[in-house]
Amino acid sequence: MRMKGTIMETIVQAKRVLEIFKEMSQIPRESGNEKGISDYIVNFAKNLGLEVHQDEIFNVVIKKAASPGYENRPSIILQGHIDMVCVKDHDSNHDFSKDPIANIIEGEWMHADHTTLGADNGMGAAMMLALLEDESQQHGPMQLLFTTNEETGMDGAFAIKEGQVTGDYLLNLDTEVEHDFTVSCAGGCHVHVKIPLLRENNLPGYDAGLSITVTGLKGGHSGIEINEQRANANQVLTRVLYDIQQQYPISLASFEGGVKHNAIPSKAVAVLSVRSEDVAAIKTLLAYQEKQYQHEYSVQDPGLTFVVEDVPTPEIVYAEDTTEALITYIYLAQDGVHSVSKSIPNLVETSNNIAIVRENQHTIEILISIRSSNSNSLEFLTKKMMLLAKALGVAAERTGGYPAWEYDKGSKLEEQAISLHNEMFDTPANVNAIHAGLECGLLKGVLPNTQMISFGPTIVSPHTPSERVHLPSVENVYVYLKALLAKLQ
């Protein structure tokens, strides 16, 4: 599908989509502040005489009967989120709590005025509302689900209860590259390992202090970029400490690394108590180790650096049992890619991230983030991390579970969606999956028998003031969505 003339002349069927998006842009909708936009959607449905339900966290479900002659077609759920990430340039005076978001069109693109635009996922929501108004649109029984707080934890999707929304097929409109179809996402959980923090006075003869920092790593998102096999600062530092231990007597005084559960740690720091006569030799060993690790990670992390500094001699250090459990656990724990998908090329199926190591008052806590698009593999790796803790005699707790959206290869929905797309467009459909959590994964938990797929218009630089949406792709995706609704069997 190709477009000629000025951009707005080519926006024919999606003209109403852009009008609704502009209306939505007048209403503040930062994550956690969605009542206004939720009420707008409720009133939109009421004005059309449709059945509408709003829950306590402002999720909205709208129900529309099938078009005449389509009563026996599969029931369809359209789904998108109504909150947005609110970020602005440093010199912008924009107040997201009250100021409208600008819709500026330049060439084939729409952007805001030095703020995020909110096309993620406002454009998908606008498409859903435009469809409600279109009495010429043919479709089976249809429900529209608008969720809240997607950007800060998917709270809206978490809150959806069994029976709140039902359908044979679910079309999520939150994929951000035209012609891409997402068919699977990872589920996940956290394992919190808690090592008793036993301290003791520094031993006689340990009269010098050293700080070792592993830094200069790229880090990155522990789902999207785990396939890069980048260095994990927590594990690199642990490997370094273990090797020093094998040659010199040391006491560990502190260890910390990582800041977020979903980020590959890019920095970790340990402070040691050592004998002054060993300092020079330990520094020589560290210089050698640095070169070894720089070689190991020369492609993934060329900036890897060890920073070694003299520090005051620690007066209090970890007891030997604490040090032993900490180093052994992190050294032996799986980190990075555990397995890859056999169904989708280049997709990481299961991974592990030793995300954070930090001291609490009575424990050293290791936070591990595990992801998988296969529930059985997720269970295996989670139990493996728990059993390792048990073998070392330390506590481990599993928290924060969310389900995977497992790939349903050859599903009737995927087959029809891809076939129609390839009939309509010169560019072939790109079927992919993501090694991160999506709302579809959570919704699959309450809709286990619903077939799902995700697509949407091209959005560049979401979550930044440079966010922009490609208007020809809005037209294309909307035309495709209308055709798909009419054709689904």
Label for each model-derived stretch:
Residues 163, 230-247, 276-279, 325-329, ...:
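His/Asp/Glu-rich mid-to-C-terminal helical/loop segments that flank catalytic regions of hydrolases
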Residues 225-227, 232-255, 395, 407-450:
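Active-site-adjacent substrate-binding region
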Residues 347-436:
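Substrate-recognition/cap regions that form aromatic- and gly/pro-loop-enriched pockets
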Residues 82-84, 145-153, 175-178, 218, ...:
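Acidic, glycine-rich active-site loops and adjacent beta-strand->loop/helix elements
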